[in-house]
């Protein structure tokens, strides 16, 4: 029997129109995103307080942005961005059709114009300092594939360790985490859960070993800050237990 009777028959189609047609570094670009089935815009569910998340990175994974396209009256989504430098960028569009599966769709954009000097090769980076906050991945030496993997962060300000209660909710959680594999740009969208030991704590399942870039966004005093890390995930022993969700949304 057909297992898919209750699901959307096809994967929805995602299209992006850019205005101006040529995307140029340092200039405002506008994107109109549609998610359609049979040429009709389909309704999306609110996930983590938003109907659509757009995560943008450059190919070197040194630049990151996370924005939320606004729904238009016709059911399309509109957003603007300014890219810092010429080159290739990846756009991860994260959405969930009502009654459908959470989906991450990847698009690339070639940005023309001024090329900023290239970034140095990625080195591991396990502590991030931003606006006087020191964010540390506490269990950085214990990241493995093939198991439920916790991510434990401490946050300090002027030598004082912050607690979970010091974090303001951002997108319905204590923080928002994205991990992208450097080699094949595999994308993990991770939403923290509560854990009294850490101001930011999450669990995920990492399928591929290797070097990852990680961005942790947290909100304090009404301002969202982004801490970035470069971490190594090693191969864990294969077990029988494998999660049923491989959509990249954890």
Protein language model regions, located:
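Residue-level recognition of secondary-structure-to-loop junctions
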Residues: 71, 77-85, 206-207
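Aromatic sugar-binding surface patches on proteins
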Residues: 63, 72-78, 196-201
């Amino acid at each position: 029997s057909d297992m898919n009777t209750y699901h959307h028959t096809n994967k929805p189609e995602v299209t992006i129109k850019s205005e101006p047609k040529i995307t140029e570094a340092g200039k405002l670009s506008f994107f109109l995103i549609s998610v359609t089935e049979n040429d009709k815009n389909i309704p999306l569910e609110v996930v983590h307080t938003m109907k659509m998340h757009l995560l943008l990175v450059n190919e070197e994974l040194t630049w990151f942005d996370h924005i939320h396209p606004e729904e238009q009256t016709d059911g399309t989504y509109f957003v603007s961005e300014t890219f810092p430098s010429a080159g290739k960028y990846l756009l991860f569009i994260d959405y969930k059709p009502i009654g459908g599966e959470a989906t991450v769709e990847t698009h690339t954009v070639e940005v023309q114009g001024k090329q900023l000097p290239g970034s140095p090769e990625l080195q591991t980076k396990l502590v991030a300092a931003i606006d006087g906050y020191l964010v540390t991945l506490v269990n950085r030496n214990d990241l493995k594939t093939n198991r439920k993997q916790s991510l434990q962060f401490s946050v300090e300000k002027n030598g004082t360790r912050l607690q979970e209660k010091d974090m303001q909710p951002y997108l319905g959680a204590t923080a928002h985490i994205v991990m992208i594999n450097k080699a094949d740009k595999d994308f993990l969208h991770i939403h923290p859960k509560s854990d009294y030991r850490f101001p930011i704590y999450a669990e995920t399942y990492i399928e591929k070993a290797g070097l990852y870039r990680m961005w942790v966004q947290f909100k304090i005093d009404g301002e969202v800050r982004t801490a970035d890390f470069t971490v190594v995930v090693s191969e864990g022993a294969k077990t029988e237990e494998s999660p049923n969700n491989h959509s990249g949304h954890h």
